[in-house]
Regions:
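Terminal accessory/targeting
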Residues: 1-210, 214-218, 285-286, 316-455
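Catalytic cores of extracellular degradative/oxidative enzymes
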Residues: 168, 184-280
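Short amphipathic alpha-helices and their capping/turn segments at secondary-structure boundaries
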Residues: 221-228, 308-314, 345-349
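Conserved beta-strand positions in the central sheet of alpha/beta enzyme cores
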Residues: 235, 272, 291-292, 358-360
């Protein structure tokens, strides 16, 4: 079974589900396949060089069992979209333009002396037009998830398979997963962390705190211990949050040495880059278990793009937990929305696809009463969904470890049906993907106690 499908679904080994793929020909560009905007190489047609042009529609080819019907290489297509190779070809990739690079340098040079009202005005100008970006799709993009389902469905059809077993996405039959994370941006936010832990605890939700190691504020061992001893998690947040971590490779490598030292000193497993700047190809230089720097859709981030999936995935051996929910700062200060309506919409969308809901809220921006009320409304809503919809709300490192364990599990056929072997297999469940035009329908194998519908 192909690596991407194996990691996404954890299917049983079956040679019928492996193909020799076409690598496509000609240049790389945009096209449409199965109602999804795609970016890669295709055979027999010329893709569009930008989203401003008409996108050619790509159809499946007639194929017999064992032959691949796709006029492109599905694994390469998944990689090129999820790793954001398309971003430099879109109108939204303005981060690479000279005016925006100059604006970013100027902004970070004076950021610390600017009040939030001035920063907000500057950021709105910088992000202007975000509502008009056609790809990725806001508020949540499911391109990678749709493609995985389509690829599996077509292979099932080609082999006369109507139902396929796989290892369910989350432990204990949870229908979806939500994680709360807090990026601590300045000294005022650091001082509010204890109070924020009180608020989280009041709603029975543990969270992670991403701490900036240098420049912004002092980081005492006692501060880190105050987080860990209460059952919360400490991660590293950039190096100094100056917006230049990924500016050029040599400087990144120099900073990576220091970041790795702080990862060890902080006893951290996870990392998030400042302002969601990122280059997935460079992440292997960081000694991480998991990363949280890649948005699902980045229309409201200074670096546009997005991985277009609501599931964790691997960058080498690092588990990526993508940001799938709008940040609190963007909601309050860019969209000027002091309600949980946008979050509820995103929760419904991601939960409906059994995905990961990653939230970023900042202790720096939750200190006024209005913002705090919105945040507590969100926590109360998530706590309700934990019981009503069987959402799993772990610490981020637990979600990453589950995804790592799940990759090491395998489905084994026995006289009693399918069983799961591997680390934490006692928490895993056998699920089934059933062809349900035009997509797939998921169900969990019933236990003695109950049958649990999903999706």
């Amino acid at each position: 079974v192909d690596k991407q499908l194996a990691e996404y679904f954890r299917l049983p080994d079956d040679p019928r589900f492996s193909f020799a793929y076409s690598n496509g020909d000609g240049r790389t560009g945009f096209f449409r396949f199965a109602n999804a905007t795609c970016f890669g190489k295709i055979s027999g047609q010329a893709p569009a060089s930008s989203l401003d042009q008409p996108l050619p529609e790509v159809a499946l080819r007639q194929a017999n069992s064992g032959e691949q019907p796709f006029p492109f290489n599905p694994p390469d297509l998944i990689d090129s979209i999820r790793s954001e190779c398309y971003a430099s070809h879109t109108n939204g990739a303005g981060e690479k333009s000279l005016p925006k690079q100059i604006a970013r340098i100027g902004y970070y040079a004076v950021r610390e002396i600017l009040p939030v009202t001035v920063r907000r005005h500057f950021q709105r100008m910088y992000l202007s037009g975000w509502q008009d970006l056609p790809f990725p799709k806001w508020p949540v993009d499911f391109t990678i998830d749709d493609l995985h389902e389509q690829f599996l469905r077509e292979r099932m059809l080609a082999n006369g398979v109507t139902q396929m077993p796989f290892i369910w996405f989350w432990p204990d039959a949870a229908s979806a997963c939500a994680i709360m994370t807090h990026d601590v941006e300045a000294a005022g936010g650091k001082a509010f962390c204890s109070r924020l832990m009180d608020i989280d605890d009041a709603h029975h939700i543990k969270s992670s705190f991403q701490v900036i190691p240098e420049v912004r504020y002092s980081v005492e061992p006692a501060f880190l211990d105050s987080i860990r001893t209460r059952g919360f998690e400490v991660n590293v947040h950039d190096l100094n949050h100056d917006g230049s971590l990924f500016k050029e490779r040599e400087e990144f490598s120099r900073r990576a040495v220091k970041i790795n030292r702080y990862i060890s000193e902080f006893k951290a497993l996870g990392f998030r880059a400042g302002a969601m700047y990122r280059n997935q190809d460079w992440m292997s230089e960081l000694n991480l278990s998991y990363d949280m720097s890649v948005p699902n859709v980045a229309h409201l981030e200074p670096q546009r793009g997005g991985c277009c999936t609501v599931m964790p995935y691997f960058i080498g051996d690092i588990v990526e937990l993508p940001l799938t929910m709008t940040q609190d700062y963007s909601l309050f200060h860019i969209m000027e929305d002091y309600s949980i309506d946008v979050w509820k919409r995103q929760i419904d969308l991601v939960g409906g696809r059994n995905g990961l809901m990653t939230f970023i809220s900042h202790p720096d921006y939750l200190q006024d009463d209005r913002a705090q009320r919105v945040y507590t409304d969100l926590l109360a809503y998530l706590d309700d969904l934990r019981h009503e919809r069987n959402y799993w709300i772990p610490l981020p490192y637990q979600a990453a470890q589950w995804w790592r364990d799940r990759r090491a599990m395998r489905l084994v056929k026995s006289s009693n049906g399918w069983t799961i072997e591997g680390p934490n297999a006692n928490r895993a469940r056998v699920a089934y993907a059933t062809i349900d035009s035009p997509g797939l329908r998921y169900s969990l194998e019933p236990t003695v106690a109950q049958t649990q519908p999903v999706g």
